[in-house]
Amino acid sequence: MYRIIRVLTELGVTKIRLTGGEPFVRKDFVGFLEMLSFNDLLEAINITTNGAMISKHIPVLERMDKIKHINLSIDSLQKEKFHQITRRDVFPEVYKTFEDLERSNLNLKLNVVVQQGFNTDEINDFVALTQDKNVTVRFIEEMPFNGKGQRDLKENWNYTRILEEIKTKFDPKPIISEISSTSKNFSIKGHKGTVGIIPAFTRTICGDCNRIRITPVGTFKNCLFDDGVFNIRDFLRNGASNNDLKELFLKLVKEKPANGFIAESNRKKGNVSESMSTIGG
């Protein structure tokens, strides 16, 4: 992975995100972060965690200048519901991780997947956290990456519905975000933090997307909705040089679909059916 990232930075990539589940489950992960920090072409290293194993590493992360943002996945603020959604009985530990990160000098975002029948009644509880905490709460439209294929569209809470729910208790004002931002962001008067909504399923942000993804098994993805366009791991194992890698990346990026609907329609296996744990994120 270090080699892949080095090649990508030589092509102009300046920001990366390392994701889980929980990337800190790898015993060598902190050492890997330290290695990446010496890449002079890399400006920002961001991390997504489920909160299981990051807490003890927070002091080290605070000392790494290139660690910019930590995204904590937390879909409920209620212990029993959290257990039901995640199948992990670790809510007290994850909430303590949230508190530890919020007190640190790291920029913290909470990722909340809005799921019909599970946590839609907690949307404004999450928004309320931003009143006295300098965090960004980002609500994510539920995507079909559940290992079972997508549910009926009528069941999904989309961007508009989520925003309407927030407006029942708060007065969110749009914030101008950078062009490639995945979320539509809002401020609320008197709140230290902000709120964002990621239209991941309705895919209204595709036109500005500049992201690529490499899965845990080495598959290169131009879009979350494609089924993987090339296996980088096998390419490297077959002796590819760094120049070979550069040529490959340039070729693959040129084939990036205009939006997620096109990517999904091009899938060889039909509907999206992987889980996010197999994709990575």
Positions of the model-derived regions?
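Glycine-centered flexibility sites
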Residues: 12, 20-21, 51, 76, ...
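Auxiliary Fe-S-binding modules of radical SAM enzymes
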Residues: 131-132, 142-281
